[in-house]
From Swiss-Prot:
GO terms for molecular function: DNA binding. PANTHER family: TRANSLATIONAL ACTIVATOR OF CYTOCHROME C OXIDASE 1 (PTHR12532:SF0). GO terms for biological process: regulation of DNA-templated transcription. This is Probable transcriptional regulatory protein PBPRB1582. It comes from Photobacterium profundum (strain SS9). Keywords: Cytoplasm, DNA-binding, Transcription, Transcription regulation.
Amino acid sequence: MGRKFEVRKLSMAKTAGAKIKVYSKYGKEIYVCAKNGSLDPDSNLSLKRLIEKAKKDQVPSHVIEKAIDKAKGGAGEEFATARYEWFGPRYCMVIVDCLTDNNNRTFMDVRQAFVKNHAKIGGPGTVGHMFEHQAVFQFAGDDEDMVLENLMMEDVDVSDIECEDGIITVYAPHTEFFKVKNALAATMPDVAFDVEEISFVPQTMTEISGDDVAAFEKFLDVLNDCDDVQNIYHNAEIAE
């Protein structure tokens, strides 16, 4: 498919303030996931995947446990999901997923981030059809044919496999996340995943270069500073 997957490394947060924001985002998402489903990760696969992702991003165990305990109590804040599909700098396509207890506040915060950075507001479905909801796995390797054969032997549905610079990327329907992960682990016992997540993967890329790079990075920073923003997906590709 020729797509490039951008790794968003929350674990790269360097300052205490940045780490607190990461912990807060995970805590909120884990709380909502546990409250809306089973508290047992073995029967709530969305919660299981989220906990594994949080641990990979070095979220302390006490943050995870506190979020689950809060959900166990039954009471607490009520959060709703909100998704915004807009055009960012250079008309790159952007999807912003939020968890909010005040839709008006969240919309205004996200809108302000776009307007201040000369981005364009779209409506539902404006850019979503240009992304695919995929399970994504990345790990070191150079034999994508072997990986594909292994997955086919395990009867796993795969959308695409890419190999670039010694890194293999496997794309699969998001519903196949654990099936793919278990199949890869079973056929390659020593595999170490650099990425294992469900994401919106763009079908096409928009190149960002020159002065637009700094503007785009500032735009992402402003969005990430919004308390209700959980995930940002885009099709921008920074020119090397």
